[in-house]
């Protein structure tokens, strides 16, 4: 039987999927996002960056077209019920209206593809567009890339490469995501200075290190700017974004001294992961106002943060082996069942490949992050002490992520390993 291929596009970090990654250590369970990230780290030669949310959005738009064992395997990879959701809090609340934050999905289909009415109803009337994959592959790829660039603030370009596409591709599913937001508690540019960052290989590099005092309580003055975490040698800090309801949280986590990043990620349990997320995303519910007779400023909890100013971007990452390693195997083979989606008469559809590309910039005033994904078918250890509070400097490799606590969704995550020594990150 001949199969036509669908193309799904994902925007991830710079990883090559030549091998299926080993399973986690026995007894170490992990949520889907962490399993995915472990797989990405296997072939990485440096910093890693992915957008779990962008990948999952593409799979959610594929799932209504899947049936049988293919549907079961895809649903098992996805967090939650796997259904298409249009009411994400970070995209529909106060935050999305005050900051630049959006996510879009599009299905590019050749005119030879017959999509079923039930599938088109499930994905929405505006989700499908035509592209001439059979007649002019280069033009179809140009249309996909242009759409991805437009919907990521022009940060993601050339998502698809015509030379990497199957000549039997007739359909591509794409997600594009863009976030530009400001810290609730901003860094002062005059406080940024070059400081030493030590890579895992022992090389010492100079990076522009931002600095600020972050209050962990208070809603007016002082204003809560983030949270601090310390347990079993693991230290972390978070920074909140301005924007109100639905605002995600930026988090950075240092492994225990002497532990390699991969060893730290591979050994993390689901309980530890959830503890870090819940502790670092806890916003202060108390109405605190400094006024005569009120609590003195020095009695507020706080921590002192030094964080590199950095940028990361990834080349296009192939996700096929990663998804196969997570149990989604049939969709890429002749066993694929996308009968609920449609066909390229008289041939059924299967997935040929999946690709993702990401970019992020962390600055004194805030950050911007973008991702695009395409699919191709052929507990807290306690509050910091009162007074001055602890100091935390991210001067060695760390894990970072952007997390939506109300949606329980990891939007972006990555590791920062530092620049190549001799290659400057930028002036302070």
Regions found by a protein language model. Give the residues of each.
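Soluble, non-membrane globular domain cores that form compact, hydrophobic packing
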Residues: 271-275, 428
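Sec-dependent N-terminal signal peptides
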Residues: 5-14
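Extended hydrophobic
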Residues: 173, 230-231, 235-253, 383-426
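Non-catalytic, conformational "gating/processing" segments within enzyme and secreted inhibitor domains
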Residues: 84-263, 283-385
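Short, positively charged
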Residues: 19, 23-36, 367-389, 424-428
